[in-house]
Design a protein with these regions (language model features):
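Eukaryotic gene-expression regulator signature that favors modular helical reader/repeat domains
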Residues: 1-671
Length: 671
């Protein structure tokens, strides 16, 4: 129903045009063009001659054939190989009627691909307005004028709005790429166009910048901006305008950001409710972008107006919790973070209970980045996973984080076991589980904790895992990055790394013959000393034929020089020492440490390289569904936790949090 209505709305646009009929001979011609391109050419001259002939034909056929599914693909491929004169030919052909392509499902992609090549063409000339290539410049400005004159239709058309976004990027000489905040589904469906704009050596002219400012004024001064911000078509366009303006003229960008904040009906709220825009599935993306782009001064103003005293409301809301994550990620002053952390740290278990794990990982990430509240966070996490008391439980925090389960669930304790422990202060006999499954969010959380200033408790807990559990960790897609963080951390000493290597003795072959394990083992190899490398090579050398015959182990066998180690150990050691000397010399010349990070002048420590971590929650699912508890792992059995269930589960302990969650989910107490 929704789909048909959307198509109907698009057809009602002034941009909609009927497609011209294309004869079969023309279609067959472009099919043969595809075959010829795939076969290749003997010389560059033949290829250039062929392309010239095809583009000469496209001057006549271009506007028609680009609107067909099969032939539009051919044109997109041709455009990537086109010379400047060919780009000019197509621009000339398309300029006869821009409207035909702007709203067409396939033609818009061809035009978008063509616009992406304009910076490449214009970067070759010093002044676009005074050269023979002036026509590319003027045809592009002609398209800009057409879009500006028809902005009301262009910004609401699902295809024309994409063209408009690419045009804005070319005008500003900025490729925003994936900086536009949107759903994961949208990101996957729209990977063409924007990522292919090559802005290298391209500096837009003053004329381009003036046109950009005109577009900005028209788009951000709309009388219906309050509705457009919550529109799936307009929201990415407005974000693109702000992103480009941020690079070209940040002063004006900050001015428009403040103007957005004054839009009536979107940002107003009281102490017990969230702003309308923060709860909207599309509008919330704009709030995230504002947090990304705002200056330090404006961040403070924004925090006081929208967030202060209401962070718990954001934390439990299925949409707004992503805004809270962005707020935490973008905080730069310790004073601000102290205030945010103080308001949230007492509710970590409650956030885990509603499955908003991203907020917790962002807190850990920022504690690491700003170097504050690290001990407080670790203590709160241990309390949330029920391993703070008794003291004996503290060493079990690593497997609890990695599996993302509470102590009682992980060790299979019953209600009677918990009650008995409370009465006697002694731990009853419990199961001895083996860690096999690693939770993605738990992995990210532990990676940050290992980078803290004093990760002693996490290191101790990790080293208490069984050798087979450490093997499982190294071979797991998520767990292997925890091992990376362990060896790359500047706050973990040589003795701890050596203890880890000794702990996994007997597991090297299994690790080396695993897809993730082989990569992890090579990373470990780079961070251990010569004696530890000899120990690893000795164990692998005993099974040299097995590791050499394995598809993954083969690379370890080659990179570690296992064959040479077995046959000519003395030569192997000499090569190893020579490589170490070269590496140290190379690091001294470049001024980097052993991990490849640049050293700070006047300081022996180098900044931690940030791990590339993805958004920790699935935005698409979380914004369209009610909070669903992770029953299999966490032991949840109800949609809203906090009922009279055993204390071993994560619970909403705070009455205020229960009340907030009831409001968010629409539940009211029975009288």
């Amino acid at each position: 129903m929704g789909k048909s209505r959307r198509n109907k709305d698009e057809n009602d646009s002034n941009f909609s045009q009927k497609k011209e009929r294309v004869d079969e001979n023309t279609i067959n011609y472009y099919r043969r063009v595809t075959e010829t391109l795939n076969e290749g050419f003997s010389t560059d001259e033949d290829r250039e001659l062929f392309l010239d002939n095809v583009f000469n034909q496209l001057e006549e056929d271009g506007p028609k054939v680009c609107r067909l599914a099969s032939t539009s693909r051919v044109l997109e491929k041709l455009i990537l190989d086109a010379q400047d004169k060919n780009i000019l030919q197509l621009l000339k052909a398309f300029s006869q009627d821009w409207i035909v392509l702007l709203s067409d499902r396939f033609g818009s992609h061809v035009l978008q691909k063509l616009i992406c090549q304009i910076p490449r063409c214009l970067s070759k000339i010093s002044n676009e307005e005074d050269t023979e290539d002036e026509t590319i410049y003027t045809y592009f400005l002609n398209l800009c004028n057409f879009l500006k004159d028809n902005i009301s239709d262009a910004r609401t058309d699902v295809y024309a709005s994409h063209i408009l976004r690419v045009v804005l990027q070319v005008l500003g000489g900025v490729n925003v790429g994936e900086q536009v905040v949107r759903s994961r589904l949208s990101r996957n469906q729209d990977k063409d166009g924007q990522d292919e704009i090559n802005m290298d050596n391209f500096s837009p002219s003053d004329k381009f910048k003036k046109v950009l400012l005109k577009f900005t004024k028209v788009i951000l001064s709309s009388e219906t901006l309050n509705m457009e911000i919550c529109s799936a078509t307009n929201n990415p366009l407005i974000q693109t305008v702000l992103l480009v303006l941020h690079k070209v003229n940040d002063q004006k960008c900050q001015k428009y950001l403040k103007k957005l904040l004054c839009i009536p009906g979107l940002f107003e709220s009281n102490e017990e409710s969230l702003p309308v825009i923060a709860k909207d599935e599309v509008g919330s993306f704009m709030v995230e972008q504002i947090l990304n782009l705002c200056s330090g001064e404006f961040y403070t103003e924004l925090y006081k107006k929208l967030f202060k005293g209401k962070l718990l409301l954001y934390a439990v809301h299925p949409v707004s919790n992503f805004i809270l994550q962005r707020l935490i990620t973008n905080v730069k002053e310790k004073e601000h973070f102290e205030e945010i952390f103080g308001e949230l740290c007492g509710y970590l278990e409650d956030m885990l209970a509603v499955n908003h794990l991203g907020v917790v990982t962002r807190l850990a990430e920022t504690c690491h980045r700003l170097g504050c509240n690290q001990e407080k966070l670790l203590r709160s996490l241990k309390a949330a996973f029920h391993c703070l008391e008794p003291v004996e439980r503290e060493t079990k925090v690593a497997p609890l984080l990695l599996s993302l389960t509470t102590y009682e669930i992980y060790y299979g304790m019953t209600d009677s076991d918990v009650k008995k422990e409370d009465e006697t202060d002694k731990e009853p006999p419990k199961k001895d589980p083996v860690l096999t499954d690693i939770n993605y969010h738990g992995s990210i959380l532990l990676q940050h904790l290992l980078k803290f200033g004093n990760p002693k408790q996490m290191v101790t807990s990790l080293l208490e895992l069984k050798p087979v559990e450490l093997k499982n960790l190294a071979c797991n897609p998520c767990g292997s990055h925890v091992v990376d963080a362990f060896f790359q951390s500047k706050t973990i000493g040589e003795k701890s790394r050596e203890a880890f290597v000794n702990r996994i003795k007997g597991q090297y072959l299994d690790i080396a013959c695993n897809k993730n394990g082989s990569r992890t083992l090579e990373m470990i190899w780079k961070h251990v000393n010569t004696s530890q490398k000899i120990a690893i090579a000795t164990e692998l050398g005993k099974q040299e034929h097995k590791i050499r015959g394995d598809r993954f182990g083969f690379f370890v066998h080659k990179n570690f020089g296992i064959f040479q180690f077995v046959q000519r150990r003395k030569d192997w050691e000499e090569n190893l020492n020579a490589n170490l000397k070269k590496r140290k010399l190379f690091e001294e010349i470049l001024g980097v440490d052993s991990s490849g990070n640049k050293k700070k002048k006047g300081s022996s420590k180098s900044e931690d390289s940030q791990l590339k971590l993805e958004d920790s929650d699935d935005e698409e699912e979380a914004k369209t569904k009610k909070p669903v508890l992770y029953k299999r792992k966490l032991g949840y059995e109800q949609t809203i936790p906090g009922s009279k269930k055993q204390s071993k589960e994560y619970q909403l302990k705070d009455k205020k949090m229960k009340h907030l969650l009831n409001e968010v989910t629409g539940k009211k107490k029975k009288k």
